[in-house]
From Swiss-Prot:
It is found in: Cytoplasm; Cell inner membrane. It comes from Erythrobacter litoralis (strain HTCC2594). Transmembrane segments: none annotated. An essential GTPase that binds both GDP and GTP, with rapid nucleotide exchange. Plays a role in 16S rRNA processing and 30S ribosomal subunit biogenesis and possibly also in cell cycle regulation and energy metabolism. This is GTPase Era.
Length: 304
């Protein structure tokens, strides 16, 4: 029996905020490795999802770089997020531009298209939400964007339902170069369990508080230790910028933070495969977004 070729390559997933990048990465990997939210700019740092593909002649490992959404930066944190996004595209074997044709305004894509058009990487256009978008406007948008950037391929998918994703995954695997795998077969992300735990809690903050809580919040790790019975004890700090936000996070009688903790604990237990004891508390720090330690904790470079 002929031994299968080993292939390994990098795919950067770019797009405007809230285009569905993290949802698509989770679909390609086959499980949650990136947090998702209806709130834009949920992803803050580059995170790698690791997807596997096997064909008749090859076994392929695709390293998916889930990047922060690219937008006009205003704060130091914004600048670091946009910088991380473009760094994620460097040296990639393919760059996916994911576009939400339902919510995305055409003019919002212009700076991204302008920056992308002269880049040397193989560029692929992915139009999301085919499950809800109308066909004719979708095709017209694809043609319009292709006139701006020389896309090698165009795919129509639904990151939410998975429609069109297997076909795109097959095509991406075919593009990857021959080479040894960079990660063990059972590894699905480069994120440490400690970072993943803070990301899962942050996802619940966004999902449960919706528009009530602005972006000036973070989740910081405090303790992460294994108990004698094999379970994990995790302590985290929810950092907010103003005292007036504390009751929003806590809820009446502590009901909101309890619900956030319960949902995050359940997700973590399922992902890590062990019982998790999660303890959350709230801290007010008006200048947390200027704290170098916070940047390091969430995997962002400190930028001026």
């Amino acid at each position: 029996m002929t031994e299968k070729i080993s292939k390994c390559g990098v795919v950067a997933v770019l797009g405007a905020p809230n285009a569905g990048k993290s949802t698509l990465v989770n679909q390609l990997v086959g499980q949650k490795v990136a947090i998702t939210s209806a709130k834009a700019q949920t992803t803050r740092a580059r995170m790698l999802g690791i997807a596997l593909h096997e064909s008749d002649d090859a076994k392929t490992q695709m390293i998916l770089v889930d990047t922060p959404g690219i937008f006009a930066p205003r704060r130091r944190l914004d600048r670091a997020m946009v910088s991380a996004a473009w760094e994620g595209a460097e040296s990639a074997d393919a760059v996916l531009l994911l576009v939400d044709p339902v919510k995305q305004r055409r003019h919002e894509l212009e700076p991204l298209l302008e920056s992308l058009k002269d880049r040397p990487e193989r560029k692929i256009l992915v139009l999301n939400k085919v499950d809800v978008a109308k066909k004719e406007p979708l095709l017209a948008l694809a043609q319009d964007l292709s006139q701006k950037v020389d896309f090698a391929e165009i795919y129509f998918v639904s990151a939410l339902t998975g429609d069109g994703v297997p076909e795109m995954k097959n095509a991406l695997a075919a593009l990857m170069p021959e080479g040894v795998w960079h990660y063990p077969e059972d590894q699905v992300s480069d994120a440490s369990e400690r970072l993943l735990a803070t990301e899962i809690t942050r996802e619940q903050l966004y999902q449960q508080l919706h528009e009530e809580l602005p972006y000036d919040s973070a989740v910081r790790p405090e303790q992460y230790k294994q108990r004698p019975d094999g379970s994990l004890e995790i302590h985290q700090q929810i950092v907010i910028a103003r005292e007036s936000q504390r009751p929003i996070v806590l809820g009446k009688g502590g009901s909101r933070i309890k619900a956030i903790g319960e949902a995050a604990r359940k997700d973590l237990s399922e992902i890590l495969g062990v019982t998790v004891h999660l303890f959350l508390h709230v801290k007010v720090d008006e200048k947390w977004a200027e704290n170098k330690e916070v940047f390091e904790e969430i995997g962002l470079d400190w930028v001026r």
